[in-house]
């Protein structure tokens, strides 16, 4: 398949792996965080870590929007959905994300709450049109990639004069989270992680461009390479990071130039800035309160803001203390470091959000990595 098979060529991948081994200095570590959940999935799916020398380590960051959603926001959505006049529209990944005390949207639906899975923002608009006597709330979630469709949906609701439609906004931003990790490496008792460079997200960067990452190269001295999702994309990006570290450079390089530009999608960014504004702070699972990292609807669109419309109170709840999802999202621990992984916590019975989404580090390792763990234990 054109534009896919070319980036999965085995011989080229082996050549890139050989180049990384040749250029990585065995006397020092190379610690690179991939921020995008799609990259985490690709690394596990294609076994890329097995091709790297032991001193080149990939650290899984908080790049999965479902994974970083705090339990309190799930509880807020459940409370809303339990109202008899509400239809809550959500994406499928959200249904099993655990809230407090084992609660989830899926369990709330089983108890009778009218929670409907949708595949696009347009589906939610249609449900609102078909149910004029009910309040329809869309559970908006995602990074910069999925924010423009939500903005377009709100504008469309205005044009259609939908009075029974609103949005529970949970859109978050990538650069503030990256800054939080670099500025606050020690959070509670989770621990510290050293980072030598970033593999920048692909889809997010198609929207915001490469320019926002220049801050991290200039102020923190951390190289950033924007990469695509295919195995050759990732291997080339890692080689580019190794070379920057060896040459004591800290620049933003764009490996994914076939889809990403410096300025990004100007039309999409304008649409978002027209509808949304920054929150003073927003809670991330694993990171805590991150300043200016979340979006909310501007005052002009407040009637479409479910938190305003239904006077929703912010809920903050503690995560399961046995679950290491917070430390995994910060890159401090790996899925196998969690005592729950593969025992009581599986994709069928997730105890933490990292096991829910296919882009979560735990779900990716469960699907692709646990068999290698077993082989390594047998070999040892």
UniProtKB/Swiss-Prot annotation:
Fe cation binds at residues 36, 64, 67. The keyword Metal-binding applies. One of its GO terms (molecular function) is iron ion binding. Its cofactor is [4Fe-4S] cluster. It comes from the Bacteria. Pathway: Protein modification; [NiFe] hydrogenase maturation. GO terms for biological process: protein maturation. InterPro entries: Hyd_form_HypD, HypD_1, HypD_2_sf. Gene3D superfamilies: 6.10.20.100, HypD, alpha/beta domain 1. NCBIfam families: hypD. Involved in the maturation of [NiFe] hydrogenases. Involved in the biosynthesis of the Fe(CN)(2)CO cofactor. This is Hydrogenase maturation factor HypD2.
């Amino acid at each position: 398949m054109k534009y896919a098979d070319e980036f999965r060529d085995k011989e080229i991948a082996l050549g890139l792996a050989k180049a990384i081994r040749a250029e990585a200095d065995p006397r020092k570590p190379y610690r690179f965080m991939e921020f995008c959940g799609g990259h985490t999935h690709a690394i596990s799916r294609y076994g890329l870590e097995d091709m790297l020398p032991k001193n080149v380590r990939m650290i899984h960051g908080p790049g999965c929007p479902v994974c970083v959603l705090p339990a309190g926001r799930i509880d807020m959505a459940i409370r809303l959905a339990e109202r008899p006049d509400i239809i809550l529209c959500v994406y499928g990944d959200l249904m099993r994300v655990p809230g407090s005390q084992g609660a989830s949207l899926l369990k709330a639906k089983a108890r009778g709450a009218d929670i409907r899975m949708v595949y696009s923002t347009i589906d939610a608009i249609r449900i609102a049109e078909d149910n004029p006597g009910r309040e329809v709330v869309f559970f908006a979630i995602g990074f910069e990639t999925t924010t423009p469709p939500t903005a377009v949906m709100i504008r469309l609701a205005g044009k259609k004069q939908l009075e029974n439609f609103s949005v529970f906004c949970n859109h978050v931003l990538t650069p503030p989270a990256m800054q939080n990790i670099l500025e606050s490496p020690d959070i509670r008792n989770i621990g510290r992680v050293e980072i030598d460079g970033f593999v920048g997200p692909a889809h997010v960067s198609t929207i915001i461009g490469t320019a926002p990452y220049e801050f991290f190269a200039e102020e923190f001295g951390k190289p950033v390479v924007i990469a695509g999702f295919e195995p050759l994309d990732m291997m080339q990006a890692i080689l580019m990071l190794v070379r920057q570290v060896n040459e004591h450079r800290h620049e933003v390089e764009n490996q994914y130039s076939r889809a990403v530009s410096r300025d990004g999608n100007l039309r999409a960014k304008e649409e978002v800035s027209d509808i949304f504004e920054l929150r003073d702070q927003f809670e991330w699972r694993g990171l805590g309160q991150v300043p200016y990292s979340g979006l909310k609807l501007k005052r002009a669109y407040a009637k479409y803001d479910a938190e305003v419309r239904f006077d929703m109170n912010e809920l903050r709840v503690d995560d399961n203390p046995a679950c290491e999802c917070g430390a995994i999202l910060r890159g401090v621990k790996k899925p196998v470091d969690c005592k729950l992984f593969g025992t009581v916590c599986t994709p069928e019975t997730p105890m933490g959000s990292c096991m829910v989404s296919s882009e979560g580090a735990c779900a990716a390792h469960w699907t692709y990595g646990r068999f290698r763990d077993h082989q390594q234990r047998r070999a040892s």
